[in-house]
Amino acid sequence: FRLWDLCDQCCINLFRYTSYAYGKVREYAASDEEFTRRAGFALLATLAVGDKRASDDDFRPFLPLIERGAEDSRVRIGKAVNWALRQIGKRSRGLYPDALALARRLAAEGGGGGRGGGGGGGGGAKEGPAARRIGRDAVRELTLERIIARIK
């Protein structure tokens, strides 16, 4: 990928319909290449909205991946990480508390204390301001009364 919108459109209109979409989330998120890594989180956000058959347990294991992804200082990746976190939080009442807790932790602390491995990737990753920005933005959206009222 070379453009964020092409990356997102492929996730929204193609990749999410494949049988291997969930596996690709981790594979793409582990990449050091900016748009490939973005695709991992954009695909996760798309699945959180579009895969109505998936359970909360299908998404909960991705929260640590989001936490690691939030440490990446690249803006286009941060926006996709934020998107994934917010969509998982809005998916169900079962996921909402976990997503909101992660958002609050990111906003307060700026991430997971530099934990590595497991798909965090390198390529400009650093703890701190990016994670705090992602956390603050997600908390702001996830605590809106109109958003909370829509969560089922």
What is each model feature region?
Residues F1-K152:
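Alpha-helical scaffold domains
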